[in-house]
Amino acid sequence: MRTARLLAPATLLAASLALSARAADEGFTPLFTADGPPKGWVVTEWNDLAKPAAKGVTWSVKDGVLTPGKLRGTWLVSEKEYTDFVLEFEIKLTERGNSGVALRTPMKGDPAFDGMELQVADFRYNTQAKDSELTGGIYRAIAPTKQVYKPTEWNTVRIELKGDRLKATINGELVQDVDLTKFDQPVKRHDGTDAPPVKDRPKKGHIGFQHLSRNNEPIQIKNARVKELK
């Protein structure tokens, strides 16, 4: 009887932890569950989402890992639009790898300047990069608070957008917690012209993943999921 009484609290604790884990997962939708090209997503040119990628260029999932096609310079963009959401995923780059996450982007123009792009890049991709062009930065607009990127390893990313508030963690470390309305200065595009200030960027749009690694070095993404917020 004493053994039974001792086991009961442990059993209850295990059940409680299991319930907590399920509750934490509630509302999340996995993004890439089936092998092959992801359904509900389109592949476009990297600098203008209105331009489809070259014929035959695809992104594909195998054994739960998403990888881009062989052509450098593409985005994989959701057909669905999102307003307020939490996006979680793991990403692994090689040396000189360059990726990014499109947030609330329209289906035209460059997500880095016409929507928002959270940069994910190996520091060797551009050794002259400004802070806002490093991993965790909102590209050319908002520098991350710290660098916690792990080169050539899996990195865990969590992005939360609700209204004008953006929070982002990488490997469990908070790198962004900002009020987007505070960023009222134009941002320079790659051609030197002005892009809208972050405060004026869309409040609703698509999400996406970028492949811009040098020498077409691969990127890998897994365990991607999204939860829409009310």
Region spans (language model):
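Carbohydrate-interacting regions of secretory-pathway proteins
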Residues: A21-K230
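Bacterial N-terminal signal peptides
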Residues: A8-A18
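Positively charged n-region of N-terminal signal peptides that target proteins for export
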Residues: M1-L6
